[in-house]
Amino acid sequence: MESLASLYKNHIATLQERTRDALARFKLDALLIHSGELFNVFLDDHPYPFKVNPQFKAWVPVTQVPNCWLLVDGVNKPKLWFYLPVDYWHNVEPLPTSFWTEDVEVIALPKADGIGSLLPAARGNIGYIGPVPERALQLGIEASNINPKGVIDYLHYYRSFKTEYELACMREAQKMAVNGHRAAEEAFRSGMSEFDINIAYLTATGHRDTDVPYSNIVALNEHASVLHYTKLDHQAPEEMRSFLLDAGAEYNGYAADLTRTWSAKSDNDYAQLVKDVNDEQLALIATMKAGVSYVDYHLQFHQRIAKLLRKHQIITDMSEEAMVENDLTGPFMPHGIGHPLGLQVHDVAGFMQDDSGTHLAAPAKYPYLRCTRILQPGMVLTIEPGIYFIESLLAPWREGQFSKHFNWQKIEALKPFSGIRIEDNVVIHENNVENMTRDLKLA
């Protein structure tokens, strides 16, 4: 396997090329990319957890250090001012020496406000990308060059196409997340609470709650009906029926985003439905290829949902085509089939059709779909179908012409289990689709 250092060297070359093109298109001399700053809680001296600017960590795997700056022009070696204060109150990260530091000029920055004296004197044609526009103004950056939309759209569009370095990092993140999912299932089987299952997950992945790329969804029984449930009960339920875990990991700034659902018992209708959703998810992935719209796969899965609703007699006396046409599948899968994945969990440019930022919205019928792109080699996406029994979505169907087709008795029997979601992370290649999750044997 090619070393991470070698892959990173090629990664930087790709970013340099993209930067040259962006600077030429928008007539800028360089980009000043800010890692970000700590922000205090209102009326307090305690900061919120630091989250790095994703455009910064695209260049360097520095994710925990505020007040860092990158100057890139697409030609010269990227210059990183790394914040290195003298501070006995807080931990100070040492000046990095790692696989990537040969390709970046790393300079210590002892004072957060000292960057102004280190930048080129002429800054009128430098673009700033970062979360603190007022800092850019203080440095003399032109207001029109602060987070310029055209530049950001251009960079976002090409972030969709992962370099081999990025894919290597994402495969490592998968390994960590898979370890966490296995530990969490074991904790569930042993009767632990959501809170304790989450601790087991974090321990297995080597993450803290502030390190994971998104808040873990650890949902037992009815809690799986809340799509982004993050409460974490401290007490285990009296009866364990089901467990939905949506949890990821991060490696060098790149995310994994996996979901699995387990039934406490293996011989009930819910367990069979979990198996069937899993089988249909794998069958859909087997059909995926470059050159097809991601929207098509979302539409295809609604056909598969209809098949399962009919098979399990949740909807009766109606064709699968009619179910989809009249959106009877909608309340059972109210979210999109997935989303782009990378430096961010819901990665950027899901709706961009070109490097000018042309936007193609999700279909009106499925507004929560997060991607309308034509699949191309290098893209990484999640495939995460589900079936849920959510009363607020089912309630409107209890009246009206279609109510008679809903097997309400069956639905009531399944509601205590609440929901099913199965999520893998896939890479689009020229002639195949790589399932990073299943390659690690996560069932």
From Swiss-Prot:
Q: Mind telling me which GO cellular component terms the entry cites?
A: cytosol
Enzyme Commission number(s) of this protein: 3.4.13.9
Q: Name one Pfam family in it.
A: PepQ_N
Supply the InterPro entries for this chain.
Creatin/AminoP/Spt16_N, Creatinase/aminopeptidase-like, PepQ_N, Pept_M24, Peptidase_M24B_aminopep-P_CS, X-Pro_dipept-like, X_Pro_dipept
* UniProt binding sites for Mn(2+) 1: 257, 339, 384, 423
The keyword Cell division appears for this protein = no
Q: How is the cofactor bound?
A: Binds 2 manganese ions per subunit.
Q: Which GO molecular-function terms appear in the entry?
A: aminopeptidase activity; metal ion binding; metalloexopeptidase activity; phosphoric triester hydrolase activity; proline dipeptidase activity
Obligatory cofactor(s): Mn(2+)
Q: Where is the signal peptide?
A: none
Catalytic activity line of the entry = Xaa-L-Pro dipeptide + H2O = an L-alpha-amino acid + L-proline
| Residues the entry annotates as binding Mn(2+) 2 | 246, 257, 423
Give the enzyme's main class according to its UniProt record, as a single word.
hydrolase
Q: Which UniProt keywords apply?
A: Dipeptidase, Hydrolase, Manganese, Metal-binding, Metalloprotease, Protease
* Gene Ontology process terms (BP): proteolysis
**Which PROSITE patterns does this UniProt record tie to the protein?**
PROLINE_PEPTIDASE
So what family is this one in?
A: Belongs to the peptidase M24B family. Bacterial-type prolidase subfamily.
What is the annotated role of this protein in its UniProt record?
Answer: Splits dipeptides with a prolyl residue in the C-terminal position.
Q: Which PANTHER family is this protein grouped with?
A: XAA-PRO AMINOPEPTIDASE 3, XAA-PRO DIPEPTIDASE
Q: What is this protein called?
A: Xaa-Pro dipeptidase
In its UniProt entry, the species of origin is given as: Shigella boydii serotype 18 (strain CDC 3083-94 / BS512)
Gene that encodes the chain: pepQ
